[in-house]
Amino acid sequence: MKELSVDHLLGIKYINENDINLIFETADHFKEVINRPIKKVPSLRDITIANIFFENSTRTKLSFELAQKRLSADVISFSAAQSSVKKGETLIDTVNNILSMKVDMVVMRHSNPGAAYFLSKNVKASIVNAGDGAHEHPTQALLDSYSIREKLGDVAGKKVVIVGDILHSRVALSNIYALQMQGAEVKVCGPKTLIPRYIESLGVTVEPNLRKALEWCDVANMLRVQNERMDVNFFPSTREYAQQYGVDKPLLDSLNKEIVIMHPGPINRGVEITSEVADSDHSVILNQVENGVAIRMAVIYLLASKIQ
């Protein structure tokens, strides 16, 4: 059986293209499984997984839990509000207490960049990064690339523009790593205040004009503005942002070409994209959600195989 080159999924920059291909091949199998009348397989009946979320999450947490249960793993979940970390306990002590209950794998979301990496060096369990601050969100990038592959046949050679709040987005960074690793060309588009200064050092081109970016691309991945990570105003108003960087149907129609619209969610309808665009044939947003379960099943299964 083929194996991943890593014992943890901490970020896209820690894996290679062979790992991505193996995850996609495994996800192809699980995509077929989750579309059967009986959507469960007994693959991980002897594995216990803890989902530890120190930041709020709806889609990602539900997707991980469903993926784990589809694999027949035992699952425990808790949020920071219920955690002893609130009482002063360290992250390592919290996780080691959980591991002492014979937990095999930890899926963690944390506000601090590098938290998952830090944990992997200090505890004896397989760690999956479900998002660490504005650093990485590897399973989101994997499901995004998988969705492009599903829609367009391949990721290699495709032109992808990531639009919006690049500065505060863990999705953007993981996507850049994953897309480039698979041979795609990447540009970013957004207000200058929301583009990191280092971005061009990653081999990414900045295109400040949305129309030009859309005329160039095959795929547009629309990111929301992450107001919860901002302590100052990065643009004059939401209305002005939507006028400059929002995608609506008249804009898409005027391009005279087919492009794929993606969004990691949650969508701010009328800001990044209008409802007409979100619900159109251009959009693969709900496909991304479905593919997220298959991708997370694949990641968990492959990492658990190394434990066993």
UniProtKB/Swiss-Prot annotation:
Record's keyword terms, sorted: Pyrimidine biosynthesis, Transferase
PROSITE patterns membership: CARBAMOYLTRANSFERASE
GO-annotated biological processes: 'de novo' pyrimidine nucleobase biosynthetic process; 'de novo' UMP biosynthetic process; amino acid metabolic process
Lineage top rank: taxon: Bacteria
InterPro entries named among the record's database cross-references: Asp/Orn_carbamoyltranf_P-bd, Asp/Orn_carbamoylTrfase, Asp/Orn_carbamoylTrfase_sf, Asp_carbamoyltransf, Asp_carbamoyltransf_Asp/Orn-bd
Binding positions for L-aspartate per the UniProt entry: K87, R170, R224
Binding site for carbamoyl phosphate: R59, T60, R109, H137, Q140, G265, P266
Keyword Chloroplast: no
Reaction equation(s) it catalyzes: carbamoyl phosphate + L-aspartate = N-carbamoyl-L-aspartate + phosphate + H(+)
Pathway(s) it belongs to: Pyrimidine metabolism; UMP biosynthesis via de novo pathway; (S)-dihydroorotate from bicarbonate: step 2/3
EC number(s) from the headed UniProt entry: 2.1.3.2
A single MF term (Gene Ontology): amino acid binding
Family indicated by similarity: Belongs to the aspartate/ornithine carbamoyltransferase superfamily. ATCase family.
Family annotation (HAMAP family): Asp_carb_tr
Function field: Catalyzes the condensation of carbamoyl phosphate and aspartate to form carbamoyl aspartate and inorganic phosphate, the committed step in the de novo pyrimidine nucleotide biosynthesis pathway.
Quaternary state and interactors: Heterododecamer (2C3:3R2) of six catalytic PyrB chains organized as two trimers (C3), and six regulatory PyrI chains organized as three dimers (R2).
Protein's recorded name: Aspartate carbamoyltransferase catalytic subunit
